[in-house]
Design a protein with these regions (language model features):
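A solvent-exposed, acidic/Ser-Thr-rich amphipathic alpha-helical stretch
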Residues: 83-153
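Short hydrophobic/aromatic patches at helix-to-coil boundaries
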Residues: 206-209
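Short, low-complexity N-terminal intrinsically disordered segments enriched in polar/charged residues
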Residues: 2-6, 10-75, 79-83
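Hydrophobic pocket/interface hotspot
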Residues: 65, 77, 112, 152, ...
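Short beta-strand edge/turn micro-motifs at domain boundaries
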Residues: 2-6, 11-14, 32, 147-153, ...
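Catalytic core of tubulin tyrosine ligase-like
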Residues: 160
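Short solvent-exposed loop/turn micro-motifs enriched in small/polar/acidic residues
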Residues: 59-60, 133-135, 170
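Short, solvent-exposed loop/turn segments at secondary-structure boundaries
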Residues: 100, 164-166
Length: 209
């Protein structure tokens, strides 16, 4: 009689116990949830009740910011930040503060100016090769409105072409926008959570995403 036939006749449990007693092996129930699985840290945004006009204003601001990066208009892009504005790319999504934590980027206006100087320096040979980016921004959500401050969430995809090499970056933006005296928004905080932030790269990320 085959093992399958024995299993049908005696029941699978009996056969397993018999095999265990003969071999000394111990069966382990399958873990369908994944033995090493961790709970998801994917951020889920809140949704505030905002006017259609404010929604469109926020969307257009984010689209323009992305367009300035693609055009390499660094001065105009950094000009979107408040004097105390911060650009932050954390290493891990569970990080809550850019101070005292390892980060991919953690730059105030002064450090942005330093990076811009490196990107535009005539002897920056890493920038001599033809390269460019293309941003796609969507799923824009207004999370909260508090006076002149608006918190937003959005998703992005970036394609970077450098010579013959294409790299893709994806993730989410979280902006804290503050309306200035002239009525326009300035960025108090831009948080960039990279989906592939811990991936291995042949060379470092040199410009803002």
């Amino acid at each position: 009689m085959s093992t399958n036939e024995v299993g049908k006749a005696l029941g699978t449990g009996v056969v397993i116990e018999a095999v265990e007693s003969m071999t000394g092996a111990e069966s382990i129930a399958p873990d369908h949830m994944g033995r090493g699985a961790r709970p998801s840290t994917q951020y889920v945004p809140d949704v505030a009740h905002a006017s259609h006009a404010l929604q469109r204003e926020v969307e257009n601001f984010l689209y323009r910011q992305a367009a300035l990066l693609d055009a390499k208009r660094w001065q105009d892009w950094t000009g979107l930040f408040a004097d105390d504005g911060v650009y932050w790319v954390p290493v891990a999504p569970e990080q809550t503060d850019w101070l005292g934590e390892p980060s991919i980027f953690a730059e105030d206006r002064l450090l942005m100016e330093v990076r811009m100087g490196r990107l535009t320096h005539p002897n920056a040979w890493s920038q001599a090769a033809a390269w460019g980016t293309n941003h796609l921004v969507g799923n824009v959500v207004i999370e909260a409105v508090d006076g002149d401050t608006v918190r937003t969430y959005s998703r992005f995809q970036v394609m970077e072409l450098r010579r013959d090499t294409v790299r893709h970056f994806g993730g989410s933006y979280r902006h804290t926008l503050r309306r200035g005296a002239d009525g326009s928004f300035r960025i108090a905080l831009q948080r960039v959570d990279l989906m592939n932030g811990q991936a291995a790269y042949d060379y470092v990320i040199q410009a803002w995403l």
